[in-house]
Regions:
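Structural beta-sheet core signal
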Residues: 24-26, 112, 182
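Short N-terminal targeting/anchoring amphipathic segment
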Residues: 76-96, 108-111
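Acceptor-binding helix/loop patch of EC 2.4 sugar-transfer enzymes
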Residues: 56-63, 83, 111-147, 165, ...
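Membrane-proximal helix-turn-helix segments that form the acceptor-binding/catalytic region
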Residues: 70, 74-78, 97, 101-105, ...
């Protein structure tokens, strides 16, 4: 979602009013960024949110995502070195790659805000054709990572009770109930 149309800003604005501070790293498509930049900058400044927009890359498929992950890792390291991050809130799977690595390497708590079963959604939506061996490998990679995200995160946010129940139905996941909260988009 473009940052201006997502639930992210209202969510963290509420938390800043409770005394928390944020560095928000987002990937923005150039046209949307140019259209909304001044508004989002003003909202962030007014609420003491440090926004770090990065350019979203789409092509070539897969390699562009690897490039975006590298950019995210670099800025996350810079922010941690300068400010000493105390929690990383990862909205979806790509950012969770960074959150999990920071948890493992630096001991920083990691909140996994899953949104949905991303790898399955890519397959169900026809974006990843499992007949293609590369997409089949990427799908398997993220399904394995998904288990690590659930197991190793300090807390998980699911959009639905059905999502939470699905996770808890998997082998060796039935004990995760207390660390999974359901927060629908409409909240």
């Amino acid at each position: 979602d473009p940052l201006g149309q997502s639930q992210v800003l209202p969510y963290i604005i509420g938390l800043t009013k409770a005394g928390y501070s944020f560095h928000l790293v987002s990937f923005e498509k150039p046209d949307r960024y140019n259209e909304n930049r001044l508004t989002i900058e003003a909202i962030c400044k007014e609420n003491s949110i440090e926004w770090h927009p990065l350019k979203y890359t789409k092509r070539p498929p897969l390699l562009s995502t690897v490039w975006d992950v590298l950019k995210m890792r670099r800025i996350s390291n810079q922010l941690h070195n300068k400010h000493g991050l105390s929690l990383i809130h990862c909205r979806s799977y790509i950012s969770a790659l960074i959150g999990l690595s920071f948890k493992r390497q630096k001991g920083i708590p990691f909140l996994f805000d899953m949104r949905g079963f991303w790898a399955d959604e890519r397959v169900d939506g026809g974006i990843w054709q499992l007949k293609n061996p590369i997409f089949k490998w990427v799908y398997g990679y993220f399904k394995k990572k998904e288990v690590h995200f659930f197991r190793e995160s300090d807390h998980v946010v699911s959009l639905t009770k059905a999502g939470k129940n699905e996770i808890m139905s998997w082998d060796e996941m039935d004990d995760l109930g207390p660390k999974i909260s359901v927060i629908p988009c409409c909240v």
